[in-house]
Amino acid sequence: MCHAILGIKWEPGDVVVTTNHEHGGGLTPLNIAVDRYGIEVSMIQVPTGNRQSASTYVQLFDERIRALKGQGKRVRAMMWSSPTYKTGTMLPIADLMEVVKAHGLISIVDGAHLPGMMAYDYGALGMDFMSGAGHKWQCGPGSTGILVIRNKMRASNPLPLPDWFTIHTSSYARQQPRGAYDIAATVTSCGSLHVPMFRALARACEMWDSIGRKKIETYDLTLSAYLKEKIVERWGIDSLYSPKDDPKLVSALTCFNPFRNRDDVMNQQKATTFVNRMLSDFSPGFVIRSVNFEVIGAPAQHYGIRISTHLWHDANDIDRLVESMWNLSGAMA
């Protein structure tokens, strides 16, 4: 995200429209751009739970952009996470790209969880920039990542390419020929490359390819759907922060409120204790995490419990997890 955001040729007063559920990986370079270039950030309050649809996000972004333009603001870009690391909501890239194209904007997607989880064709989606982690669902080494940069005008995005300059490279020639410029070669040229680390990432990618990325996506999402239904059976539909019924919004991340006293989800210490006890009180224990985020209309942040369903899990793992979480939530009531 630093490469994408800080390489753009910003002007003072440029506005980036984003959400209030972004990761620090995107917010940090965005805040640097605010102080360094004088850009402005407009944050949309996003919904949580099952009562939302892909059209919700199209409307939220489009209305905000139109309102800003009506105020005389110069909106330059949209930045969003697909999925959000907080609730696992898959903001619909293809749908939001229609908003991008309608308003002639730069598109920046924090897709940290996409590689290894979803079998997306990034060229067909058409975003200008998409950053993905190499060490999450792709299961490569830590400190590796994937950056997708749109390098041509095509049907998926006929907008002119944004002016962008690499911020970390050991090879740069001035006045590059735009038609033949190998932007990937410049971005990946970094002097003393950590060869074993990146070869390990490439090997992990090859393994995923050999299994079949669409097969992995289907398996992960099927397990996630099973988990969500099991949560609804015990805690009710309102316990979910993740949507489950709109296929455009689902991911293999699930976030919910496990507490019998619903307000306990605003207690950070209780959420931390729940995560710690899920690891310590059961054999084998469970590795889950707590994430904090704003909920529209809530008096304080919620500390939801987030669960990942990977290709090495199965339905029996989900059953044992749900039963254990139910028992622990009862013990903590």
Where are these regions (language model features)?
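PLP-dependent aminotransferase-class I/II
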Residues: 18-78
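PLP-dependent enzyme catalytic core of the Aspartate aminotransferase-like
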Residues: 268, 277-281, 290-333
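Conserved beta-loop-alpha segment that forms the PLP phosphate-binding cup at the N-terminus of a helix
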Residues: 1-15, 23-27
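Helix C-cap/helix->beta junction micro-motif
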Residues: 37, 102-103, 282
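Conserved PLP-binding catalytic core of the aspartate aminotransferase-like
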Residues: 221-225, 232-282
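Structural motif of enzymes handling amino- and sulfur-group chemistry
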Residues: 172-229, 252
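Active-site PLP attachment segment
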Residues: 125-177
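Active-site phosphate-binding strand-loop segment of PLP-dependent enzymes
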Residues: 51-112, 116, 137
